[in-house]
Amino acid sequence: RRNDILCIFTRAVTSVERQTALEQEARGRHGEPAPQVCIAGTPGVEFLEPRPRETDLIVTKQRYSIFPGTGLAGWLKARGRDTLIFSGLTTECCVQSSAWDAFERDFHVFIAQDAVAAYETDLHFGALKALEASGAILAPAADFVSVWK
């Protein structure tokens, strides 16, 4: 933040009613109930540590990626931002979807590989491998911080 690094916090906020037929069908195939982690009005949509500060941008999304329906790409481009460093959950879902969408929108993509995680180790490392093969640069979060000092 001291070095003009914009911090963007994202959260998925949805409802069982807003799930698409495709999402409902996919979960049904696996015998899974509707997820309760991102339902509006529940603790699942609240930020844990680190929490956003007043100067940070908060983007609320309804999809895995941070881009569809948020206007974020245009907002960033209008401010001359062309590089994104991703951290967060989950590596194989929201992080990977957002990173690939960032590539499609001509952003440079970096992944703080020790600041992303998945529920399953093989999915985590598989997603990192796929992202790196697609052109993302992976590095520990400390490497990014040291560049900004």
Tell me the role of every PLM-derived stretch.
Residues 2-3, 15-21, 25-149:
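Active-site-adjacent betaalpha module
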